[in-house]
């Protein structure tokens, strides 16, 4: 879907049919506005543009577990945003499998340019944001004032349960490779 016209109501309608949780609803009543005309979809204006393809890939990955749990039409995002240089996804309840998938994509977002969606090379200080080399130059930040990002495709998840501590390595390499393929990225 990269490069498609996001202003297309046809595209928005198709996305909502595939992922009903993208349809905006009233936060208090959970109802869809009677005059809703596919003017926007959930996440479109809430996340940096560079992360939207990653977000849609996450939506694809959570769809099957939601169907399996018979929760596809009830699942809702409560908030989507950027915070401390990563995508944050809050829900109105999800299965542990869906939460695990969301956590992977939140981790991967830290390594994706928030402007264009390419792999990030730098991260700014102050207002933390990952940028590719091209966009950090346009951000007004001095390169000397930025941290270099070493792309990682796994992270350590720490769980505390019944007074004991357990660590697990979470591998995101499949999701990362699918994302790079999705955006047509090559190292050339």
Segments predicted by a language model, with ranges:
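Long, charged N-terminal interaction/targeting segments
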Residues: 1-99, 155-188
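Residue-level signal for secondary-structure boundary elements
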Residues: 66-70, 110-114, 140
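Short, flexible, mixed-charge glycine/proline-rich loop motifs
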Residues: 81, 100-111, 122-126
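Short functional micro-motifs and their immediate structural scaffolds
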Residues: 119-122, 137-140
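TerminUS-proximal long segments
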Residues: 131-139, 161-165
């Amino acid at each position: 879907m990269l490069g498609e016209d996001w202003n297309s109501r046809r595209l928005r309608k198709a996305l909502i049919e595939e992922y009903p949780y993208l349809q905006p609803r009233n936060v208090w009543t959970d109802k869809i506005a009677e005059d809703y005309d596919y003017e926007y979809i959930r996440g479109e204006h809430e996340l940096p543009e560079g992360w939207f393809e990653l977000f849609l890939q996450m939506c694809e990955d959570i769809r099957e577990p939601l169907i399996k749990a018979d929760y596809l039409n009830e699942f809702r995002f409560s908030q989507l945003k950027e915070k401390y240089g990563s995508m944050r996804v809050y829900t109105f309840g999800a299965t542990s499998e869906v939460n695990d998938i969301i956590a992977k994509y939140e981790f991967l977002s830290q390594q994706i340019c928030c402007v264009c969606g390419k792999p990030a090379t730098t991260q700014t200080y102050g207002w933390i944001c990952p940028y590719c080399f091209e966009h950090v130059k346009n951000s007004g930040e001095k390169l000397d004032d930025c941290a270099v990002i070493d792309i990682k495709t796994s992270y350590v998840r720490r769980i505390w349960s019944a007074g004991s501590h357990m660590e697990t390595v979470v591998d995101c390499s499949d999701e990362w490779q699918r994302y790079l393929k999705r955006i047509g990225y090559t190292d050339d």
